[in-house]
Each structure stands twice: as C-alpha cells, then as structure tokens.
Amino acid sequence: MSNHITPIVYIYQLDTSYASDFLDYILIDRDSSARTRNNYKVWLASFCNWLIEKGYLIQNPVERIKIIAEGDKKRSAFSPDDLQKFRLYLQQENPYFLLLCTFAYYTFIRPIEITQIKLKDISIAEQKVFVPSSISKNRRDGMVGLNDAVIKMMIDLDIFSADDDCYLFGAGFKPSRTPVTTKVYRNYFNKVRETLKFPDSYQFYSLKDTGIRDLANAAGIVVARDQARHADVSTTNKYLKGDALTVHEETKHFKGAL
C-alpha cells in the first residue's frame, strides 16, 4: 500500500482523509467487494477507538466515513460508442494515457499491478507481459498476452527506447524510474470522463471490465478467464452483466433426446 498512498510517520497523522484513501484503495485498487471495504472500515474505527483510549488520538477520524451499500458496484463497462469517443479524444489530447488505457483494456492487469510493471516484464517477441508474484493480487506469478494494437502503440511512442528497469507507466504515463500511484491514473481518467460528459459509473477499472466483456464475446469466456488470471469462470462471469453474459455456442446447436 505504501506505493499507492503517501505513508504516515506519526499516529496523529491518521486523519479522515488518510482513512478514506485507504478504504478507496481496498475497494477500487484491490477490487474488493463493498462488504470487504465496510469490514475494513469497522475494523479501522475500532482501532482508532483503542488509540483514543490510550491517548494517542483525540477523536476518531473514521466516524464521518459512511458505510456504503453492499449491492452491485456502481461501475459499468463502456458502451462501444463511448469507447470510440474515448479513444478518439485521447488520440489527440494524450496518446500516452491512451496507451495506458489500451494496455489495461487488453491485458486485464489490475491498476495497482500496472503501476509496478516494468519494461523488463514485457516480451515483444512472444507478445507477453509477466506479472511477478511480488506485485500480483493473488501473490502468484502470472503471464498475459499482449495484443498487437498495444505493441504497435508502444513502438509508435518509442516506449522501448527507455531503460528496461523503468516502470512502464510512471510520471506523465511514460516510462520512468519512479512509479506513480493508482490515484494519478484515476484522477486523470476522471477529468477525461468529465470532459466527455460520461456517467460516473465509468471508472478507470471499467477498462478492464470492458476488455473482459469484449474478449469473452469474441473468443469465449474461457479465454477471457485465462487472460484475467481468474481461478474459475464464475469469477469472470462477475464482470459480465446483462446482454454481455456469454453462453456456449454448443448449447445452441446440440441435438438432444427430447
């Protein structure tokens, strides 16, 4: 977490803003459920009450933070038309951020993991991205495919001229020896969303949702499952809603006994 939220040194620095950022990290960056986020909120509030009892804090900084509804996340995949508007706008305004978004869309790598991906993790020859266990959510090494469109953009933007030890998307969304936080990605995305008058349900993480939907529809849910590094198809299905839910083609054409 220290790579994504500015660390505090003294306990009195634990304020509402820091606690809120931490809970956003749990919900958005780790892609946890609303229930998990709320459980962390309850735990953090109890911890702060203990700090008050011991005289380390004067008031509880978590009290003003609300519990959120535990239904479906208020996040949706892009519509095809909006995805094209998004692409055309960024082609003109910020091709480096467009590369980041395209990378997220095709690889399904989580934003928190993307901040730690280095150029050395990419194989152009094999069109693969290695996700080390040290940065992955499930603490296991992973390998995902790198789409032709992403490689072309990287070559056009001269990304591979940077040192292999550079983080792929650092300051300015360019290769850098210093990583940035997921909040940097999120804040810029939100500005673009506002400019294009997109709904609040479009979030940076929606790029992954959209990519999973589109790959599942094009190549099948099993392919999408493996690219997303999900343990089973049921996890992948959570990213598909309504008309985006897939069915096996075999179910449409097999000859039954009835």
Q: Where are the language model's segments positioned?
A:
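Short, polar N-cap/turn motifs at the start of nucleic acid-interacting alpha helices
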Residues: 121-126, 199-200, 220-238
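Catalytic-site neighborhood detector that most strongly recognizes the C-terminal catalytic loop/helix
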Residues: 133-135, 228-253
